[in-house]
Amino acid sequence: MRGGEQDLRAGLKALQLELTDSQVGQLLDYQDLIGKWTKVYNLTAVRDPVEMMTHHLLDSLAAVPPLRRHLRKTGQEQGACLLDVGSGAGLPGVVIAICCPEVAVTCVDTVAKKAAFIKQAALALKLPNLSGLHARVETITTLFDVICSRAFASLADFTQWSGDALASHGVWMAMKGKQPAEELASLPPTVEVFHVEQLQVPGLDAERCIVWMRCKSAAAGLDQQG
């Protein structure tokens, strides 16, 4: 058994997340790749492998079951497009690409070396559904079904900057620590929060949640359909 594999498999079991042996191997290879690149390019402040497992991999993996439920509920299990904003080392975008091969994942970052890392990860991990993009999210006009972020910006800035890239039926999926009451209160009236989902990250004694949001116009359309 590889280093970190036991902790990873225990975490997957706690999250009730079933992955193939190949996907487990890809996650471990991804962690190794982050470690190698960080020595040269300082991709992440977390360098200890054990800490990287809990604070990066398992933290990102905790978002996969909620994402899968959303895609299943909305009939987007095949062919959905997801944008990970301010992706950095690819968290959670690369993790999602590994766990959800049917989802086309684009990781965007304003730092060239981080976008280059995503492109290298796509090649090294053999992930045809993953792409890296060096750009400001405000310049993206391609439409996405899900736009996610992890430890990125305030909810107001996140939704404003990425708004032009959100499909009419699309949702924002913001990974946060504890429930961000002030940020929620600062959202514009055009954005609706339809769910705040608490997350339990194995081995991490800290609050985590996902704030699910959509445009008010999209919410009105769903209500009319109902």
From Swiss-Prot:
Enzyme class: transferase
One GO CC term, this protein: cytosol
Alphabetical keyword list: Cytoplasm, Methyltransferase, rRNA processing, S-adenosyl-L-methionine, Transferase
RNA-binding recorded as keyword: no
Protein location: Cytoplasm
Annotated EC: 2.1.1.170
Residues holding S-adenosyl-L-methionine: 86, 91, 137-138, 150
Catalytic activity: guanosine(527) in 16S rRNA + S-adenosyl-L-methionine = N(7)-methylguanosine(527) in 16S rRNA + S-adenosyl-L-homocysteine
One of the record's GO molecular function terms: rRNA (guanine-N7-)-methyltransferase activity
NCBIfam families tied to this protein: rsmG_gidB
Family that this chain belongs to: Belongs to the methyltransferase superfamily. RNA methyltransferase RsmG family.
Summary of the function given for this chain in its UniProt record: Specifically methylates the N7 position of guanine in position 527 of 16S rRNA.
HAMAP family: 16SrRNA_methyltr_G
Protein known as: Ribosomal RNA small subunit methyltransferase G
Species name: Polaromonas sp. (strain JS666 / ATCC BAA-500)
